[in-house]
């Protein structure tokens, strides 16, 4: 045990020493984080969570969410005021602020600041680029079929050899002047504005894109709160405060002095990509990271029986936040596979055999069992509804196997056990444990599971090509509306967010009917009816909604749980004096102390 603790202390010391390297001129206002692996800093390509969140630090969007308002509320970001909607409910008029500038960068060749001003032309260019078929933007779903002419533009670009179509534009994006533009929708869509707050819809500089070319994804030039100082792939990103960021304040800041300071409050953010969870954990304990998630394997050392922080960590000045996530986890069936698509009874049997209680144990209780795709707290989630196929019941599952023509799991064509593949997007011990649970559950009804543990690249390649049978995945909501989760079953989204390739004319009819509906009890009732309908078709095994546990040191200020605070870092601050004082008293904690023994 002593050797283990000594080794862990050495690892911590190594990371602690690296924190000081290149940490900047003013470490007092520097925040240190462990971030996920960033693939790209191109907003139109940043479909993964780590990239999306990082993009939000460098770029700005037309709208944002009020950081403290509940329920969630959209407010202007790059706009002077909320956009005006005409009587037809299809035309929005936007007016940009006049203090928006792209950050200083080599691509502007020392041009005057006024030449870096963000204009309506930049907005239109950014949105057209998402629609450019040659880019294959994975976030085109935001605009597809919603903005007049965007679908035709996408088709035309696939045949174009230059960018002349950008000059021609489309009817759905009209420039009035440098600060005013209009967006014409194909039909009323009360949720359209949500898309304009997602980092995918960030406004980029055409000049920067042309200057950097293929390396644009590594050189962000935005009008957001931070600018890139350094990016060493798979190791570290360093972000500096963007002094040209528009004037914005946070009147609810913990520190009274910070309430009068323009955002961002931090001078620097250092993001490490630490692959080993134990290294990140030890670095956090010694004050080298300002906040930390809690890994599955470390949960018992951190959280006690009453979901409270263990005494040793509480004494260290660490705070625990529990937050239900706007996320649904599920096991999907491939509806491109006739075996699964054409046999509802088989899907019912598999759903009933899946033991969610074991999954809950696997996650240390950090989840809420799901009855459908809509998370708790969202209009359309019916707390009284019970999905008939979400209750673990082996007896019923075996009966459905018989009705599916696979009695006791035997394939009548071969006389052997029905065999299905099961894909996951990771190969760690946690994924292996989940695979073992699946093998055990399906074995009880005679199905043989062949687990496929993939890296993320291979996993999503399989999903795009439909080369799978069963797969486990999650969906993190992009905006606070049930439609964002129901779209995962819409046939026109098959191959993109509809990973199961589910196609159902009746569901499509229901989905298209709710698109133009305003928020109302009637719309909420429609959502509930759609969930009940899906429960009878078993397109997924509706597994769970995640609950995240996060740890903060007390010197980190202004952290507010928020599912859509994409640019959260601009509000955060650190009390440097408190950090220095607290770290002086830190000493390595033994496993005995961590466990409160």
Please place each PLM-identified region on the residue numbering.
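N-terminal lobe/hinge region of extracytoplasmic solute-binding protein
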Residues: 34-87, 221
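Extracytoplasmic/peripheral linker and loop segments enriched in polar/acidic and small residues
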Residues: 20, 315, 348, 352, ...
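Append "and occasionally in soluble cytosolic enzymes with long acidic Gly/Pro-rich linkers
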Residues: 240, 251, 341-440, 444-445, ...
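A structural "hinge/loop" feature
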Residues: 36-56, 106-112, 138-139, 190-201, ...
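Periplasmic binding protein-like
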Residues: 33, 284, 441-491
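Surface-exposed binding/hinge segments that line
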Residues: 121-206, 223-232
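Aromatic-rich, solvent-exposed beta-strand/loop patch
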Residues: 103, 184-203, 220-279, 303-327, ...
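Aromatic- and charge-enriched surface segment that lines or borders ligand/interaction sites
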Residues: 81-142, 182, 280-283, 340-342
């Amino acid at each position: 045990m002593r050797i283990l603790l000594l080794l862990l202390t050495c690892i911590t010391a190594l990371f602690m020493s690296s924190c000081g390297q290149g940490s900047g001129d003013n470490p007092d206002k520097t925040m240190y984080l462990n971030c996920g692996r960033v693939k790209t800093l191109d907003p139109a390509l940043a479909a993964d969570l780590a990239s999306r969140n990082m993009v939000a630090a460098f770029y700005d969007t037309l709208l944002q969410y009020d950081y403290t308002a509940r329920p969630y509320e959209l407010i202007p970001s790059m706009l002077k005021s909320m956009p005006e909607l005409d009587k037809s409910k299809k035309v929005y008029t936007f007016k940009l602020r006049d203090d928006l500038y792209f950050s200083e960068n080599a691509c502007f060749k020392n041009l005057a600041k006024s030449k870096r001003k963000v204009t309506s032309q930049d907005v239109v260019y950014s949105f057209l680029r998402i629609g450019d078929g040659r880019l294959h933007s994975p976030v085109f779903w935001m605009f597809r079929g919603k903005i007049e002419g965007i679908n035709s533009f996408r088709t035309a670009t696939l045949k174009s050899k230059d960018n002349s179509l950008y000059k021609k534009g489309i009817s759905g994006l009209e420039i009035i002047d440098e600060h005013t533009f209009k967006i014409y929708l194909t039909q009323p869509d009360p949720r359209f504005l949500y898309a304009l707050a997602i980092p995918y819809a960030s406004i980029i500089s055409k000049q920067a894109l042309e200057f950097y070319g293929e390396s644009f994804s590594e050189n962000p030039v935005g009008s957001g709160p931070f600018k890139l100082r350094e990016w060493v792939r798979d190791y570290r990103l360093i972000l500096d405060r963007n002094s040209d960021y528009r004037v914005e304040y946070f009147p609810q800041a913990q520190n009274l002095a910070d309430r009068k300071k323009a955002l961002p409050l931090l001078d620097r953010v250092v993001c490490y990509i630490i692959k080993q969870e134990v290294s990140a954990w030890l670095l956090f304990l010694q004050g080298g990271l300002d906040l930390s998630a809690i890994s599955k394997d470390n949960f018992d050392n951190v959280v006690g029986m009453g979901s409270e922080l263990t005494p040793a960590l509480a004494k260290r000045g660490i705070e625990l936040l529990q937050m239900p996530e706007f996320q649904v986890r599920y096991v999907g069936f491939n509806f491109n596979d006739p075996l699964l698509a054409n046999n509802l009874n088989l899907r019912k049997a598999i759903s009933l055999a899946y033991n969610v209680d074991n999954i809950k144990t696997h996650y240390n209780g950090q989840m809420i069992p799901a009855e459908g795709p809509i998370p708790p707290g969202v209009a359309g989630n019916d707390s009284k509804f019970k999905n008939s196929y979400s209750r673990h019941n082996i007896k019923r599952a075996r009966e459905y196997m018989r009705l599916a023509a696979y009695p006791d799991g035997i394939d009548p064509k071969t006389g052997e056990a029905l065999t299905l593949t099961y894909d996951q997007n990771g190969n760690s011990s946690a994924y292996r444990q989940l695979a073992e649970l699946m093998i055990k559950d399906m074995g009880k009804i005679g199905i043989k599971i062949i687990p496929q543990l993939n890296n993320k690249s291979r996993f999503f390649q399989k999903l795009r090509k439909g080369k799978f049978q069963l797969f486990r995945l999650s969906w993190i909501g992009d905006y606070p509306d049930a439609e964002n989760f129901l779209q995962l079953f819409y046939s026109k989204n098959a191959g993109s967010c509809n990973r199961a390739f589910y196609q159902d004319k009746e569901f499509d009819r229901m989905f298209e009917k709710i698109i133009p509906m305003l928020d109302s009890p009637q719309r909420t009732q429609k959502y509930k009816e759609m969930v009940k309908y899906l429960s009878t078709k078993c397109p997924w095994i509706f597994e769970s909604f995640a609950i995240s546990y996060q740890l903060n040191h007390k010197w980190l200020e202004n952290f507010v749980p928020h599912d859509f605070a994409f640019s959260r870092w601009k509000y955060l601050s650190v009390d440097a004096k408190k950090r220095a004082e607290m770290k002086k008293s830190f000493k390595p904690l033994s496993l005995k102390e961590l466990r409160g023994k």
